[in-house]
Swiss-Prot record:
Leading EC class: lyase
Lineage of origin: Bacteria, Pseudomonadati, Pseudomonadota, Gammaproteobacteria, Chromatiales
Gene3D superfamilies registered for this protein in UniProt: Dehydroquinase, class II (3.40.50.9100)
Family: Belongs to the type-II 3-dehydroquinase family.
Active-site residue numbers: Y23 (proton acceptor), H101 (proton donor)
Subunit text: Homododecamer.
Protein name in UniProt: 3-dehydroquinate dehydratase
Sorted UniProt keywords: Amino-acid biosynthesis, Aromatic amino acid biosynthesis, Lyase
Amino acid sequence: MAKFLLLNGPNLNLLGTREPQIYGSQTLAQICDTLREQAKAHGHVLEDFQSNAEHELVERVHRASREGIDFILINPGAFTHTSIALRDALLGVAIPFIEVHLSNVHAREPFRHKSYLSDVARGVIMGLGPKGYALALDAAIHLTQKN
C-alpha cells in the first residue's frame, strides 16, 4: 500500500466559484473525494491538505517525510511562480512529486509562465481541469508500483 499526499495552494479552496470558466465548477472537496476513492480502489491511501499560507504547505511537506508519504501531488497555485521555500522543502524531503495545474499556465499571463517546481518535479500535468489530478494520481500509482 502506497501513501499519497495531495497538496493544494492558495485560493484553491475557492474552486467551484472562482473563475469557473478557467478552473471549472468542481469544488476542491469533490476533487479530493474522487482522488481518495481512486487511490482506495488501487489499495492505496491519499491524504489531502490545502492552505493559503506558504509556511503551512512547507511544514506539511516536512511532516510528509516523517509520515512515510511515498509520493506527493501538488497544485501550488500562485506559489508555483514565487516559492523558493516550497521548492527547497520538496527537494529537502526527497519525496517524488507531480506538479498539477487545472489551467494551462503557458496560455495565460506571462507572469504565470515561470515555475519554481517544474524542473525538479517527476512530471507536470496542466490544462486538463480536474481530470489532471486523476491522471497525476494514475501516474504516481504506476511509478510507485514500478519502484
